[in-house]
């Protein structure tokens, strides 16, 4: 969410005064100096085929003209547009948790998390609500949308997130043709990308909120991992399409802040969600994954930051609350292990396709 981290978690200047009576979905948009994206993002939301939603923008102490623009935007429709202004940058996790808590208090069926550097298609919210309604038993925790690249909408940006035995996260379909049949089929995924994902609000009471120790990066993998440990599912919903710029807040694919936090959070993710036996079984591929990443970031000029992040994660891991690992059935751990193996193989194949395509020119 930003290039500065703070330990403050619940400081804000203005509570939105929402009184939900018939709206089903609360759209939560964290913002940090994202004025260049906000007009297009809000314009797309105003063209939705359903109107049973409200929009809450949570600003993480932006500078510049963001606040002036947001006040004007909110005043145009105060019943359905809400604004919460933080005095400090709470990161992605802290900001969206404020929205989720309000959604729980106000009785919204669904919480839609949306990055400010997105443009949703007109039937986006309708498609997600419709799919959630097809799950009357409430076993679907989250829906990951079909994210395509803003500069080339025919190319996939994210079709749900995966997690591997190497301790790496990757995006399904990244860079592939969005029209391929495989990306137009619903499927179970390991995690929803929280840049454009709908969550069943009530299940946060069981699964827990986003971990604010993460601040930003891998927090969506963490909450989806927990949901699976507790027996819930995460699905990829191809009918909900959104265009995405990518790295709109952090500003680049790799930078010192992002590399350090991602490294630290990768340690947090394992510590919180894998029991000791599972860590022992997977120790070799995990060590290999950390080594390869260290060498990769050395070449990129961020080797020191990656190592510092890993060490910080190891040193501070006990500050975190683990998932309720003792309550998870053994067969569920086996199921997750098999998925990690499958996703590791998929990652290798995806990488192979990418380099084969490059070689062919």
Report each predicted region and the residues it spans.
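Non-catalytic, C-terminal membrane-associated alpha-helical segments of glycosyltransferases
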Residues: 279-361
């Amino acid at each position: 969410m930003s290039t500065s981290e703070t330990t403050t978690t619940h400081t804000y200047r203005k509570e939105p005064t929402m009184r939900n009576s018939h709206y089903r979905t609360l759209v939560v948009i964290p913002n940090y100096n994202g004025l260049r994206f906000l007009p297009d993002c809000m314009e797309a939301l105003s063209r939705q085929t359903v109107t049973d939603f409200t929009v809450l923008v949570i600003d993480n102490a932006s500078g510049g003209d963001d606040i002036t623009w947001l006040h004007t935007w909110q005043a145009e429709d105060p019943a359905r547009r809400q604004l919460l202004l933080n005095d400090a940058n709470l990161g992605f996790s802290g900001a969206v948790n404020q929205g989720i808590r309000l959604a729980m208090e106000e009785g919204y069926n669904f919480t839609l998390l949306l990055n400010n550097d997105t443009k949703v298609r007109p039937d986006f919210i309708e498609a997600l609500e419709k799919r959630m309604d097809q799950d009357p038993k409430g076993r679907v925790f989250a829906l990951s949308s079909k994210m395509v690249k803003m500069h080339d909408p025919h190319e996939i940006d994210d079709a749900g997130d995966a997690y591997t035995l190497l301790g790496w996260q990757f995006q399904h379909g990244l860079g592939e043709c969005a029209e391929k049949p495989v990306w137009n089929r619903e499927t179970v995924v390991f995690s929803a990308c929280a840049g454009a994902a709908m969550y069943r609000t009530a299940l946060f009471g069981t699964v827990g909120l986003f971990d604010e120790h993460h601040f930003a990066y891998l927090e969506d993998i963490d909450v989806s991992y927990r949901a699976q440990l507790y027996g819930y599912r995460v699905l990829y919903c191809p009918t909900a399409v959104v265009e995405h710029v990518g790295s709109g807040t952090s500003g680049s694919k790799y930078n010192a802040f992002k590399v350090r936090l991602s490294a630290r959070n990768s340690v947090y993710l394992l510590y919180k969600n894998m029991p000791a036996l599972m860590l022992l079984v997977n120790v070799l591929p995990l060590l290999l994954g950390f080594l390869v990443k260290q060498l990769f970031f050395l070449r990129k000029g961020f080797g020191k930051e990656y190592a510092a992040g890993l060490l910080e994660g190891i040193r501070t891991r006990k500050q975190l609350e683990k998932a309720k690992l003792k309550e998870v059935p053994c067969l569920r751990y086996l199921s997750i292990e098999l998925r990690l193996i499958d996703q590791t193989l998929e990652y290798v194949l995806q990488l192979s396709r990418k380099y084969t395509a490059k070689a062919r020119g």
